[in-house]
């Protein structure tokens, strides 16, 4: 099946005090989701199950992200999660704390019929 990107949306999330990379990633994905709309699917007669949703998240410690928590946020289509090194850790040496910032991109792919 050939696909074409219909939506690319970005988001940012953070965890201020817990150094929780999953929490920051979830917030980044939710932020991106709140900026997008799929109302056009009904007009084009495209079933949500046909979509491919690529979720890309960047944090400083990708191995610390629970992919299943991110995947559970997406309620449509075939979901693919990619976590890479990115985002930002802001260290506060005086307080002994780290602010975790995650970035996310959601890419919704539509099926395209070849003529």
Where are these predicted regions, by residue range?
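Short, charge-rich amphipathic segments
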Residues: 1-9, 91-93, 98
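C-terminal edge-of-domain segments
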Residues: 76-115
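Conserved mixed alpha/beta catalytic, RNA-binding, or beta-rich assembly cores of soluble enzyme
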Residues: 2-45, 60-65, 105-115
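A generic local secondary-structure boundary/capping motif
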Residues: 43-45, 70-71, 90-97
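Short glycine-rich, basic-tinged beta-strand/loop micro-motifs
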Residues: 46-60
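Short, hydrophobic/π-rich interface segment
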Residues: 57-86
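Broad gene-expression machinery/nucleic-acid interaction feature
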Residues: 5-7, 50-54, 101-105
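A generic structural signal for short, non-catalytic loop/turn and secondary-structure boundary residues
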Residues: 1, 46-50, 74-76, 99-101
């Amino acid at each position: 099946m050939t696909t074409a990107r219909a939506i690319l949306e970005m988001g940012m999330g953070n965890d201020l005090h817990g150094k929780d990379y999953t929490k920051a990633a979830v917030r980044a994905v939710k932020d991106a989701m709140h900026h997008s709309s799929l109302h056009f699917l009904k007009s084009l007669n495209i079933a949500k199950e046909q979509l491919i949703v690529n979720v890309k998240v960047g944090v400083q410690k990708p191995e610390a992200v629970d992919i299943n928590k991110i995947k559970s946020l997406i309620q449509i289509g075939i979901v693919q999660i990619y976590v890479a090194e990115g985002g930002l850790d802001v260290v506060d040496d005086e307080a002994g704390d780290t602010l975790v910032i995650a970035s996310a991109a959601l890419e919704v792919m539509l099926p395209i019929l070849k003529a």
